């Protein structure tokens, strides 16, 4: 009965949004709809002491992922100008992040550790994918190619990786409780992407429209930074590179 009611609510809300909201706002409005629905049920669950109701929160990530993949597919294959920060997208995604991690925190002593571990990994990977979707949009919009594009993708890969390197040794949730996930699984696509970036960057000269200085130009400095980051990840035992 709970699942039937939840599915009915989602379908009714989706139809209302499709009927009354402009197409360019569908992505952000649907995320807000999913997020507020989960947040409201979580509050109701605590109010009436019905823990099973709060487990509807496990739907938030899959729903948002399906929505994002659908919109990304439309942007990629149909040519619609859709990207995460469009309209109220950033505020909607901020609400999603807050509710998602609040839900995972509240479930830490209720649900199985394996299930929560998987959701931490998948949530982080989903957030990474949104960053790369956003970056690919602005790369096309600003027509950045060659060295400019290489620096853009360097930043997209390095910033979250450096954040993980600085946070995984903190004794705070969720990094302390799920240290294996945040050191092994979550950074894996970042490190793989950075390795591929380094290989691709070796084929660029580093010359830009600005003043060019051999060795001390942005691309060469970025490549040096990658080597330092890889050395530090080995030292910190990320994805068990120190074994």
What is the meaning of each model-derived region?
Residues 1-243:
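Alpha-helical transmembrane segments of multi-pass membrane proteins
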């Amino acid at each position: 009965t709970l699942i039937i009611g939840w599915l009915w609510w989602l379908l009714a809300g989706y139809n209302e949004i499709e009927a009354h909201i402009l197409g360019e706002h569908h992505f952000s409005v649907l995320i807000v709809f999913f997020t507020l629905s989960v947040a409201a049920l979580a509050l109701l669950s605590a109010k009436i002491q019905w823990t099973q109701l709060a487990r509807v929160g496990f739907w938030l990530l899959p729903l948002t992922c399906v929505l994002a993949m659908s919109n990304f597919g439309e942007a990629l294959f149909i040519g619609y100008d859709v990207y995460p920060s469009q309209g109220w997208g950033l505020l909607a995604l901020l609400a999603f992040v807050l509710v998602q991690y609040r839900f995972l925190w509240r479930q830490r002593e209720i649900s199985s550790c394996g299930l929560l571990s998987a959701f931490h990994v998948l949530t982080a990977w989903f957030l990474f994918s949104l960053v790369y979707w956003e970056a690919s949009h602005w790369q096309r919009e600003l027509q950045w190619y060659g060295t400019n594009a290489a620096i853009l993708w360097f930043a997209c890969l390095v910033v979250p990786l450096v954040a993980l390197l600085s946070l995984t040794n903190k004794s705070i949730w969720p990094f302390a409780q799920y240290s294996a996930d945040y050191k092994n699984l979550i950074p894996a696509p970042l490190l793989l992407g950075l390795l591929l970036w380094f290989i691709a960057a070796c084929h660029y000269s580093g010359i830009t429209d600005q003043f060019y200085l051999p060795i001390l130009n942005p691309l060469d400095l970025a490549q040096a930074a990658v080597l330092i980051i890889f050395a530090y990840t080995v030292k910190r035992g990320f994805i068990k590179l120190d074994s």
